[in-house]
Each structure stands twice: as C-alpha cells, then as structure tokens.
Swiss-Prot record:
It comes from the Archaea. Pathway: Amino-acid biosynthesis; L-arginine biosynthesis; carbamoyl phosphate from bicarbonate: step 1/1; Pyrimidine metabolism; UMP biosynthesis via de novo pathway; (S)-dihydroorotate from bicarbonate: step 1/3. Mg(2+) 1 binds at residues 282, 296. Coiled coil: none annotated. It comes from Pyrococcus furiosus (strain ATCC 43587 / DSM 3638 / JCM 8422 / Vc1). The gene is carB. Belongs to the CarB family. Mg(2+) 3 binds at residues 809, 820. Residues 131-325, 661-849 form the ATP-grasp domain. One of its GO terms (cellular component) is cytoplasm. ATP 1 binds at residues 127, 167, 173-174, 206, 208, 213, 239-241, 282, 296. Residues 400-536 are annotated as: Oligomerization domain. NCBIfam families: CPSaseII_lrg, PRK05294.1, PRK12815.1. This is Carbamoyl phosphate synthase large chain. Mn(2+) 1 binds at residues 282, 296.
Length: 1056
C-alpha cells in the first residue's frame, strides 16, 4: 500500500569526487524514474550539471544549487513538497537529511522522510551508536570505542593495542581513516581524521589483519520482509577500502555454512536499523575459523549497490524507491525479468569482477599505496563464464595501456621489486601477482605477503601456465583454451609472436537474474568464448551501436555518459533501435532499460568488431563516448565499419598534432608556434628559438599527462630529465605559451552550418580547460575576437566536413590562436546545453541522423542566445589524495564539476563556487599570498579588507598582516583561517600550507584571477544585500534576463 505523497524533493550528491561518484547519478536517476511511474512530482536539488538526472527526461523540476541546509530550506519553502528522499545522493544527501531533521526544518514544513527513518540513519552512521545497536541485538563487532577528541582516541588505541584502524563517523570513501601500527603513526594522522568527520567523532577499532571482507546488499520493506540480493567478496583483505578493492560477485570462497551465517547477520543488521529500502552491510570473516564481525552498514544506495545492480540485473535503486513510498516486496515485480516478484533473490550463472582505476600519475607527492581511504577515480566491471576470463577482461577495461599478460608481465626485473610492490599495496594487484609468479614466486609466497585467498592466486597461476606454454608451443588447441580463459588476440600475438587466425567466434549471452531457471526476455548481454550458442537471435530491425565512455578517470567522467544517453534517446525517438556498448557499472547508460540492447563489454577494437558482426547495425557512433571511443574511429573505419558523424580520417587529422598544425597553416589560422624535438639538446636549442615561456608535452604519455609550463631554460632541463626519455621514438613537443584569456566553443555542425555556445575561462591560460571556471555569456572578450573565433570554427567545420558535435579551444592575446579541436562531445557540453536550454545532443542527432540542423536560422553560424549567466566550477578531490600538492596547470586534476545560473553574474559565480566541497564564504579571515600576479592578489585583499575581513599574507606585502609560514600553519591548524587564496606553483615554498588546507577542509583558491572575481562577487552581494536567487532551471529558460546582458549578448549577433 502506497504512502499518500504527491510531491517529493530528491537530494543529489553534487559534484563527482573520489568516494562519491557517478553511482549516485545512476541511483538518483532510477529513483526519479520510479517516482514518475507513480505519478509523484519530483523536485531535484543537485548542482552537478553534467549528470543525466539534472535534465527533464527524469525530474519534473531541477535546481542547480549548493547542497547546503540553507539552500535546501529555501527550495522546500518554495516548492512545498510532502516527502523527501535522502538515500540516493550518497553521504552528502544523508548528512543533509539529518541536518534538516535536527534543525526542525522538515517538521516546520511537514515534510515526511521516506524510507529509513532518521533515527535509523543515525544508528548506522554514528559509529558509537552503531556499535551499541549491534551489541544490543547480539551481533559481534570488533573490539573498539568511540572518541570525541584526539587525546581520548590515543587512550583508546593504547588500551586496545596496536595495530588499530580509525574509522570516521558521517563520512564517505573512508576519508580521514587510517591504519596505525604505533602510537607515533597514530598521532601523525588523528587530527586529519577528526577534520573529516561532520560530527567530529571517530571510532578506534582493532585492525583485523588478513581477514576476508564480505558485503551483502539487503533490501527490506516496511513489513520487515528482507531479501539478500547478492553477496560480494573482496579479493583484497580487510584494511583496503571496499572502493579500492577488487570485488567478485557472487562470492567464490565461502562455504555454504559461512554464506548462510553471514546472510543471516546482514538481515539482522537491516532489522536493527529499521532499514526501509536498500542497504549495504560489510562483514569481516576470519580466514581460519567461522568467527566473524559486523563492520559497518550504509542505509542508502552506495557504490556497492550500483555494482550489485549491474552484477545481478536486480534494479536496486528503483525497488528501494518503491519500498520508500510504501510498497512491500511481494507487491513489486522485478522489471528485468518481468515475471518474478522483487522478493526473489537473484541467481547467477556467470561471474562478475570489479576493479578500480587510479590516476596517480597526475599528482605530485601523492602516496601511491592503497588502504582504508579511497583514492581511485573510477571502476570497471567485467562479466565472464569463468573467473579467469572476467579477470582478463577487467584489466583490459581499465584502459591503462597494458593487459594482464602483457608488456609489464614480460619485462624482466628482479623478483624483489615486484614483491615490494605487493607489500606496499600498489595498484593493479593482479598484474603484480602474475608477474611475481612468472619470476618464480610461489602461491604460498604471495599469500603470505598479500593475505589474498589462495583460490584467487591459483586462478592467476592458471593464466601464467597457459601464457608460458603459449610462448613455447602454441598449438591450435592451446590457443582455443586461451581464448576461453579470456586471452585477447593482442596478448596471444605478443606471446606467440604470430598473428591470430580468426577460427572461432564468441557467443552472446544474456543476464536474466534467474540463471535461466525461468524463461525471461532480457536485453542485458555479454560476449564470451566459453559457450556454444547465442542466447538471443541476431537482431532483425535496423539499429545503431553507440560506444560508451568506458572507465571514468580524470578527464573522462559523467559528462560523456550524459552525451551517450541523450544521443541514444534521440535515436530511439526516431524509431531506430539503439544498442549501447559500455562496461562502467556506475553509469546510467549501463542501465538495462536505457537501450534496446546493452552489451556489457570491453571497448576494444577486437570486441567492437565481434559485436558489430553480430549486431549488423546501420552505423556505429564513436563521438559520444569521449576519448576512448573516439580513438577507435580510424581503426574501425579501416576495418570496414560504417561510422556515423565525422569520418575517422577527419578525426585523425584533428587528433594528430602535426597533421592538425599543417591544416591550420593551410587555412591561415593562427596557432601557438610549436616544434618537435628528438633529444634534450635539440629541445633546448629550439625552445630558445620560439622564446620562453613554453609548454612541454612528452609524446609517449597518456591523457595530456606530464604537460608543464617552463618559464626558463633551467625549468625546461629539470622537466625533461623527469620525463625519463626523449628520443626519435619519444619526441617531445614544445609550443609557445601565450599568456592570454582562454575561450572555447561547444558546437554542432551538419557540414553546412554551425550552431553552438561560447564559453570564457576565468583562470588565465595554462590551466587545463577541465580545471577552469567557465562563464557564459562571455564577459571580457571583444566583439571582434568573438566574431573571429566563430569564423575560425566555421572554417574548420567546413574543411573537415564535420557532422555532429565538436569543440574548439582558443587562447586570445590581442587575436585568437587555436589550441585544439576535439571532434567529439566535450566535457562542457552538458553545461552549454543546460545554460542555454538547448540540448546539443539533440542537435547532433539532427545533424547526424536527419542530415541537417533544423534551427530555422539563415547563415553559416549561429550562437544560441543566452537566457542567464551560467558559471561552471571544477571540483577537486585533494582531501582524498593523501600527500598530493594542490596546484593548477596544463594537466587536468579535477574529478568533477558543478554549475549555477543567475540573473546576475555574481550570483551565479558564488552559487557555483559554493557548490564545490568544502567551499564556504569567508566570515572573518583570509590568508592571501603568492609569488606571481601580486597586483591581482593585492586588489583581492583590499576588497576583502574593506568588507571587514582580516587578511594575512606570508613572504610579502599582499595582506594587511604579514606572518611567518609557521604562524600560518598554526593558524590553519587552530581553525583561525576561513579561506586560502594563492596562485601558481611554489611547492618548495608552500607545500605544507596547501596540503594542510586540503587535509583540514579549508577552502583553497588556486588562481589569482578567480580570487579577484570571488572577492568582487562577495563585495557585490554585501553591498546590494541581494538574497541568493532560488530558481528552477526552466524558470531561467523561459524568461528574458537582465536588460544589459540582453543588449550585451545581442551586440554580437552571430547570424552571419
């Protein structure tokens, strides 16, 4: 029986950060879908502009606002909802729900908490209350105690005895948690742990070294009926955060007795916290007996529940929403099968493996060991008929330039080096295990070091035996067995040094959650060589295959999933079937009902061609999924695949630096001068010729990694030495650094005309566009230059016969220079679309599928008119990346983004900046310092001083009070600094200050231009006494904005 609610406010999770990523876009989207089905109006508050959920496909109303109590209260006051869902936006949403409840805001406006009651949430998230609850119901917990001060925590640690693990209350991604083996180590990290807890509380617990970590996903309804949907087993033992662990589903090493015992405990945990909806229960099991402990529970959708949904095909978030609004399990149907109720526990005839992906190369001084705190950026999930195959696929999906039995495996080095990596817990455990076994380590040796169950090590040993046999005697029978166990053609060719003849075809299998026990029609598919026949017939209707974005990493995030889902919607609206190929368990695109067929598979040339042969689509879309899909464009075209949109040949011309440069020369379009050097001496000589400053990028490095600005010869030499090798095989590109204003155009072309949006960066040149704060409409560019960048954009579209979405980046110093052209969707396209109220992916569908843009405007190019100011801000995850030095440069380091719109620019800027964690406006003090752009920093300090804020500075006369570095450090530790504003790169001078700010959640502004803009916006808000504008997205789209903006934007009417 449904609860009587007609309007529900849903709290999102905000920007993507380490520990709180796209899994909440997926779960939130499912929740919105379930509400719409029930005819309940949904009001979503989430500043994450890049997600699917902040568009009207799913939500009825969308507010791009900071996730802070005062903003949510304003939305509640305005919208008057009668219910609130807080279990679908990660820790952020749960904490906000508790805060709204405790401040009496929910009672004041009569808003019901749907799902698990707030008392239950507190029993789960407050470590002390959780321990008491477990003891009360007779469930075992490890020896532990809660502390409210560092001194108390030290006493508890001493009484329990080292080693201990410290867990933080009301927190996500294990932030601030640590393992200490001594008092000295404990004292070093305890202050940071308290800073990362919203309620300043930690739990000190006995460290269960070498115990197995097991997770259950439990669904429970208001009547107390429960289902254990899946049991996931962590390959890594206790002490490694589950988000950092390799996870296998279903569990592989539990006996039936152990499984039933832990399942029973998980259901009792759900009962004890009065869970309504979905929760995740983590348990520790002794490897030597049946002793176990309950570790923790999350009474909400989590990373593990997104994974569990994709592992089993059981739509957890959708079912959890229905339970929250009052249904019981037996009243709900499992929408995947269509024939069983939600009370059926899924049964699997395959195995799924999740492996995280790290991006440590992009961060300086970062601690690379993995442990109790999350540092991974994304994750992959592989499905196989056997564990060997699933392990192999998962490593390929990470897209790290190697495979499980690949180049690293074959490189010779001392065994001790590899064992040392295993001891330090460095990423990509399976690759180190395989290499150690090849170099002579035994299963026992590896088990002793890693505490990984021998069962998993034996699986890797099987692969190593096959690999070594392939090197010696590659028979046809052996190659066939290697394919069954997940070896790719590339691996086999590397080992045998001969081409693989395609003699066998893989089969397509479906996931029905029932292990084939009941007939069920599902479209959730995977491909394997370990099978005899296809589970589904070859498709008969015309279809289009869309390649997804694959694993998220820095630079590739939910923006590309937004593009994939929007393009797929456009295909299906046109009556054509759409198939998606993707393997990211966190995303909306890998939701089985987003497409007509979902291939949960690797995005490699070999696998795309297998699926292309089976699916026989009318074309393949590679431009929506970002770099991974786009980089296959030319290879696919060469293999005879029909690509939709811009040709693979054109993509290659834009991607290849030398070819693109020649093209710009031919068209007479200015570009920063650049050269390619094959030795350090040549690089020094050529850099002198084009004059400093220069941007240096070694060519053999992935994803814009290792790009730096060198201001003089010494910096250039230092950097090239760091780059390890510069040679004819690894030339280094050196281009003139032009310190101007950066701008870009997000556009769509049908080959005849171009339509799009201009974006201006607030930070100066030399900061990666993904780390820049962007504003639209532009504010400081001249009319002449804006007209010129549009002309250039049109010329490039015409020359390269662009059909579909693309993005051009410029630096403007008196005149525009082209920096790069991306012939695909860009990171900023969701922002461009939502800031103007026009979906660029729908326009892309017009260009690609209908053959022309239907915009009803004559001329070559046209800018979509602005409806409001839009500001997009980057979200960094410095707090999670222990030791990393926070700074901005030509290499991207942010993990997510947020945005806000406003009638006034200042309002949009402040709301956008406040949507980034841990930003708060300064009340009494600011530390402002730097060794470059001093005039801008001085102006910033002056404005804040005039507003009554005390400004401090180190090593100069920027703020009103000059203090020593040590004084600054002490003030930060004592909580006496509200905000830190600095600029540039000065690791040898201020590493401790910046790192401390990240560790203690002090807002950190890393660019002088942005600091000044924020100071001016704070001044504007103080002087005008303006309240923050609380408007729903559509309210901006349907009304004119401030007259002067209207005139200002119209002064360059781009309809040439």
């Amino acid at each position: 029986m449904k609860i009587d609610v007609s309007k529900v406010i849903v709290i999102g999770s905000g920007a993507i950060k380490i520990g709180e990523a796209a899994e909440f876009d997926y779960s939130g989207s499912q929740a919105l879908k379930a509400l719409r089905e029930e005819g309940i109006e949904s009001v979503l508050v989430n500043p994450n502009v890049a997600t699917i959920q902040t568009s009207y496909e799913l939500a009825d109303k969308v507010y791009l606002l900071p996730l802070k109590t005062e903003f949510i209260e304003k939305v509640i006051e305005k919208e008057k909802p009668d219910g609130i869902l807080v279990g679908f936006g990660g820790q952020t949403a749960l904490s906000l729900g508790v805060s709204l409840y405790k401040k009496g805001i929910l009672d004041k406006y009569n808003v019901k908490v749907l799902g698990t009651p707030i008392e239950g949430i507190e029993r789960a998230l407050d470590r002390e209350k959780f321990q008491k609850t477990m003891k009360k119901v007779g469930l075992p917990v490890p020896p532990s105690d809660a502390a409210k001060t560092p001194e108390e925590a030290i006493e508890i640690a001493e009484s329990i005895g080292f080693p201990v693990i410290v867990r933080v209350s009301f927190n996500l991604g294990g932030r601030g948690s640590f393992i200490a083996r001594s008092r000295e180590e404990f004292e070093k990290y305890i202050i940071r742990a308290f800073a990362q807890s919203e309620i300043r509380k930690v739990l000190v617990e006995k460290y269960l070294n070498g115990w197995k970590e097991i997770e259950f996903e439990v669904v429970r309804d208001k009547a107390g009926n429960s289902v254990a949907v899946v049991c996931l087993e962590n390959v890594d033992p206790m002490g490694v955060h589950t988000g950092e662990s390799i996870v296998v589903g279903p569990s592989q090493t539990l006996t039936n007795r152990e499984y039933q015992m832990l399942r029973d405990a998980a259901i009792r945990v759900a009962d004890a916290i009065e869970l309504i909806g979905e929760g995740n229960v983590q348990l520790a099991l002794s490897p030597n007996s049946e002793e176990y402990y309950v570790i923790e529970t999350n009474p909400r959708m989590s990373r593990s529940s997104a994974l569990a949904s994709k592992v089993t095909g059981y739509p957890l978030a959708y079912i959890a929403t229905k339970l929250a609004i009052g249904y019981t399990l037996d009243e709900l149907r499992n929408t995947v099968t269509g024939i069983t109720t939600a009370a059926f526990e899924p049964s699997l005839d395959y195995v799924a493996v999740k492996i995280p992906r790290w991006d440590f190369k992009k961060f300086e001084e970062v601690n690379k060991s993995i442990g109790s705190e999350m540092k991974s950026i994304g994750e992959v999930m592989a499905i196989g008929r056997n564990l060997h195959e699933a392990f192999q696929k998962a490593i390929r999906m990470l897209d790290i330039g190697d495979e499980l039995i690949g180049k690293y495996y074959l490189e010779d080095e001392p065994l001790e080096n590899v064992l040392e990596r295993l001891k330090k817990k460095e990423p990509y455990l399976l690759m180190h295990i395989a290499k150690a076994l090849r170099l002579g380590a035994t299963v026992e040796d590896i088990h002793k070091i890693t505490k990984v169950d021998k069962f998993f090590i034996y699986v890797i040993e099987d692969l190593v035996k096959i690999a070594e046999e392939l090197r010696k005697n590659p028979t046809e029978e052996l190659i066939r067995e290697a394919k069954r166990l997940g070896f790719s053609d590339w691996e086999i060719e590397l080992l045998t040094k001969r081409k693989v003849k395609k003699k066998w075809k893989p089969v397509v299998k479906n996931i029905d959650t029932l292990a084939g026990e009941f007939p069920a029609k599902t479209n959730y598919l995977y491909v394997t060589y370990d099978g005899v026949e296809n589970d589904i017939p070859k498709p008969k209707k015309p279809s289009i295959l869309v390649l997804g974005a694959g694993v998220f990493r820095i630079g590739v995030s939910v923006e590309f999933d937004w593009a994939v889902v929007n393009f797929v919607n456009a295909i299906r609206k046109r009556g054509i079937e759409a198939a998606i190929l993707n393997y990211n368990p966190e995303t909306v695109s890998t939701d089985w009902d987003m497409s007509d067929r979902l291939y949960f598979e690797e995005i490699t040339l070999e696998r795309v061609l297998d699926i292309y042969e089976f699916e026989r689509p009318i074309g393949v879309v590679a431009f929506a999924g970002g770099q991974l899909a786009n980089s296959l464009a030319k290879k696919l075209e060469n293999a005879g695949v029909k690509l939709l949109g811009t040709s693979g040949k054109s993509v290659d011309k834009a991607e290849n630096r030398a070819k693109f440069s020649k093209l710009l020369e031919k068209l007479g379009i200015p570009q920063p001068e650049w050269i390619s050097a094959e030795s350090i001496d040549e690089a020094i000589k050529l850099a002198k010729k084009i004059e400093y400053p220069v941007i240096v990028r070694p060519s053999y490095v992935l994803s814009g990694t290792a790009m730096k600005v060198a201001w003089n010869e010494k910096e250039l030499i230092d950097f090239l030495k760091e780059a390890a090798s510069v040679s004819p095989e690894h030339p280094v590109l050196i281009s003139k650094f032009i310190p101007g204003t950066e701008a870009e155009i997000d556009a769509v072309s049908d080959g005849k005309k171009v339509v799009g949006v201009t974006l201006e960066h607030i930070e100066g040149a030399g900061v990666h566009s993904g780390d820049s704060t962007m504003v639209t409409p532009w504010r400081t560019l001249s009319e002449r230059n804006v007209k010129r960048i549009w002309e250039i954009t049109y010329e490039l579209a015409k020359e390269l016969e662009i059909k579909g979405p693309f993005n051009v980046q410029f630096v403007i110093d008196k005149k525009p220079y082209v920096l790069e052209l991306n012939l695909r969707t860009s990171r900023s396209m969701p922002f461009s679309s939502k800031s103007r109220g026009v979906n660029l992916m729908e326009l892309s569908a017009q260009a690609v599928l209908d053959g022309e843009l239907k915009i009803g405007v004559e001329g070559k190019y046209y800018e979509i008119p602005p409806v409001a100011y839009g500001v997009k801000s980057p979200q960094f995850s410095w707090a999670q990346l222990q030791g990393a030095y926070p700074f901005l440069g030509p290499e991207m380091r942010s993990t997510g983004e947020v945005a806000a719109l406003g009638t006034h620019y200042e309002d949009a800027l402040l709301k956008s900046w406040l949507s980034v964690k841990p930003n708060e406006l300064p009340k009494t003090s600011a530390l402002i310092y730097g060794w470059e752009k001093k005039n801008i920093l001085k102006e910033t300090a002056k404005i804040l001083e005039n507003l009554g804020i005390t400004t401090y500075s180190i090593g100069g006369d920027i703020g009103e009070i000059n203090i020593s570095k040590q004084e600054a450090v002490n003030m930060i530790k004592e909580g006496k600094i509200d905000i830190i504003m600095t600029t540039g790169y000065a690791k040898d001078k201020d590493y401790e200050i910046r790192r401390l700010a990240a560790d203690l959640n002090v807002p950190l502004v890393l660019d002088a231009n942005l600091a000044l803009e924020l100071a001016k916006a704070i001044e504007w808000k103080t002087k005008t006494q303006e309240e923050f504008e609380i408007k729903e997205l559509r309210e901006y789209w349907i009304r004119k904005i401030e007259e002067n903006v209207e005139e200002y934007a119209a002064s360059v009417v781009l309809r040439r």
